[in-house]
């Protein structure tokens, strides 16, 4: 077992009983403390190997090892965010002392952390301006959020039991079933209202999303080197796509027009701010700067002004897909255009294009034998208005 330093932090390198070589952070810059932790870990491993003891590991040590082993995971930032929640409840607690009851108790008290962060910012602003402090009103989280946090701690504790041999038996954690919500999409008139209410550069981003179906992160992180205007194609790199494979995006006239309007604003990023903005501390941002993926203020304000409720940015992708399906695009083609990994992920839009079932449904007409006129949608609506 040896010690080495990386970026001022001390690490230990050692071999497991099975021969596997492991490197782990000791979480300290102090060499003496690192040596003490090293010796403790060495003695612990000896007891595990020779006596069959389980190591006395805390929850944060398990979290640290998880993050180190999953360093290349695309959704690592999401893992960190969920781990941060669990550390609020189990920091300093030994793994063997974490029970199902304690886990469920923590989840039952979950509140939206973003709401609390916004409240804290408002408190600081009120203090600076000498105004009355706002009251904190906790916002409950969805079943889906609870399910994702439970899945996170379940994965860590399962790894502690099966892979790291730090637990004799991990708690049995049941993940609540999450119902698939309806596909939320906009009518063309609603989309036009939303676009009209969006300030730049959000307006261009929304247009591009509706024209291509790309996810927000792919649009905000889009670079000029990923675009070939002559061939009318854009590329999403494998490390940036949800399916972990490269995606070619066909650029229609609308998308090309949006891109041409961005030329000359930045040498690298396609979509950027061009006007300075005030920060919470009163300072100003640079005029030309990359857009933030997590910024929602302008989006929510535009939706409110347009009279559109319960609509997320990702629903623009649903809108794009819904429009294509209603225009007669086959599911298999939509899957390729949207870069979905399986056809099952596209079937959520199938109900929007039931026209291919019409001929089969007409078999019932043959059974009744009635002479039923084949009326168009406009004719039917006209008759309804007359009634």
UniProtKB/Swiss-Prot annotation:
Residues 181-362 form the Tyr recombinase domain. Keywords: DNA integration, DNA recombination, DNA-binding, Viral genome integration, Virus entry into host cell. GO terms for molecular function: DNA binding; prophage integrase activity; site-specific recombinase activity. The keyword Ligase does not apply. GO terms for cellular component: cytosol. It holds the Pfam family Phage_integrase. Residues 57-161 form the Core-binding (CB) domain. Transmembrane segments: none annotated. The active site is at 215, 242, 314, 317, 340, 349 (o-(3'-phospho-dna)-tyrosine intermediate). PANTHER family: PHAGE INTEGRASE-RELATED, PROPHAGE INTEGRASE INTD-RELATED. Integrase from the cryptic lambdoid prophage DLP12. Integrase is necessary for integration of the phage into the host genome by site-specific recombination. In conjunction with excisionase, integrase is also necessary for excision of the prophage from the host genome. Belongs to the 'phage' integrase family. Encoded by the cryptic lambdoid prophage DLP12. This is Prophage integrase IntD. It comes from Escherichia coli (strain K12).
């Amino acid at each position: 077992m040896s010690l080495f330093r990386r970026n001022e932090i001390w690490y230990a390198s050692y071999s497991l009983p099975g021969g596997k070589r492991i490197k782990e952070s000791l979480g300290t810059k102090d060499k003496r403390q690192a040596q003490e932790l090293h010796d403790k870990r060495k003695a612990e491993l000896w007891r595990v190997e020779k006596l069959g003891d389980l190591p006395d590991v805390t929850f944060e040590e398990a979290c640290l090892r998880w993050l180190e082993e999953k360093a290349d995971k695309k959704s690592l930032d999401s893992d960190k965010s969920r781990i941060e929640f669990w550390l609020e409840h189990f920091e300093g607690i030994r793994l063997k002392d974490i029970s199902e009851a304690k886990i469920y108790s923590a989840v039952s008290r979950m509140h939206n952390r973003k709401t609390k962060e916004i409240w804290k910012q408002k408190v600081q602003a009120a203090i600076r301006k000498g105004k009355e402090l706002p009251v904190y009103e906790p916002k409950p989280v969805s079943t889906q959020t609870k399910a994702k946090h439970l899945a996170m701690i379940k994965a860590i504790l399962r790894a502690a039991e099966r892979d790291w041999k730090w637990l004799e038996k991990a708690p049995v954690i049941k993940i609540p079933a999450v119902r698939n919500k309806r596909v939320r999409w906009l009518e063309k008139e609603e989309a036009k209202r939303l676009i009209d209410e969006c300030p730049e550069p959000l307006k261009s981003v929304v247009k591009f999303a509706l024209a291509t179906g790309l996810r927000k992160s792919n649009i905000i992180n889009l670079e000029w080197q990923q675009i070939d205007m002559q061939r009318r194609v854009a590329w999403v790199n494998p490390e940036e796509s949800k399916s972990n494979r490269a995606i070619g995006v066909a650029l229609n006239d609308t998308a090309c027009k949006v891109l041409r309007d961005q030329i000359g604003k930045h040498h690298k990023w396609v979509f950027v701010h061009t006007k300075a903005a005030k920060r919470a501390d009163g300072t100003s941002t640079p005029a030309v700067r990359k857009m933030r993926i997590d910024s929602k203020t302008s989006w929510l304000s535009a939706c409110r002004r347009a009279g559109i409720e319960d609509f997320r940015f990702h629903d623009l992708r649903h809108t794009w897909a819904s429009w294509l399906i209603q225009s007669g695009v086959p599911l298999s083609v939509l899957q390729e255009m949207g870069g979905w990994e399986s056809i099952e992920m596209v079937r959520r839009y199938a109900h929007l294009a039931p026209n291919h079932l019409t001929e089969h449904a007409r078999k019932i007409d043959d059974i009744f034998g009635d002479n039923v006129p084949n009326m168009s949608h406009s004719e039917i609506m006209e008759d309804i208005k007359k009634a």
